[in-house]
Amino acid sequence: MASIISPKAEVSPKAKIGDNCKIYPFVYIEDDVEIGDNCVIYPFVSIMNGTRMGSGNKVFQGAVVGALPQDFNFKGANSFVVIGDNNTIRENVVINRGTYDGGKTVLGNNNFLMEGAHISHDTVIGNRCVFGYGTKIAGDCVIGNGVIYSTSVVENAKTRVGDLAMIQAGTTFSKDIPPYIIAGGKPVKYAGPNNIIMEAANIGEKVRKHVANAYRLVFHGQTSLFDAINQIKDQVPDGAEVQNIIHFLETSEKGVITKMKDAVASILSRQSKFFSKI
């Protein structure tokens, strides 16, 4: 089915628009843009040069996709934003393209970006992540699959967040947050394994215990991170999730967060139960 493009939208004839899209009035789409099938672009959205968008995406009022990077190193490079399928990009979200020639900001599939979220240049995001209201992700970050950011989280540049992690509202962090955990506070700290979300992701009880044991060695032991990793290899049964933890810890360049007090950890655990239902 042919796409429906409002005559009040400003869509470049050079832009490539897929089938069965709906583009509302006052949308602005530049020349070097590709949009897949079955996308809905609501009024007052701007989609800028270098944007490559898959199918089934919804972009809401006031969002800017493919904005020039807010980086002093940007000198007009031919860079991109690459977006997968079935993402929801809500009102006033900004996604910057890469800084250097060929650079890419990447958003995978089935992600939900709430109002006012900002994804900066060259950040790579996996699938099924949630970004709460006003969350700000700085440049060159790497974010795994199934990560939940609560409201107004600020992630500093070149940090990483592992799969199925959850981050408390209002948290600002500049160190890596490993997979399968709850984290939050100021400064950000470890609050325990993210058991509710792991269970929702069909990770069995035995594996969840292995994850908990691995992080007990990392966050409750009296050894260095290097020694804790070796203890995980020696003491925790192997499996995909444990290997994911080991690889994440071994490749951390910014360092990882530390342990949180029990009272705050209890609050974050209750938040995790809430998000597992959405």
Descriptions of predicted regions:
Residues M1-K8, P13-K14, D19-N20, G56, ...:
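Terminal amphipathic alpha-helical/low-complexity segments used for targeting or macromolecular assembly
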Residues S3-K189:
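Structural signal for interior beta-strand "rungs" in well-ordered beta-sheet cores
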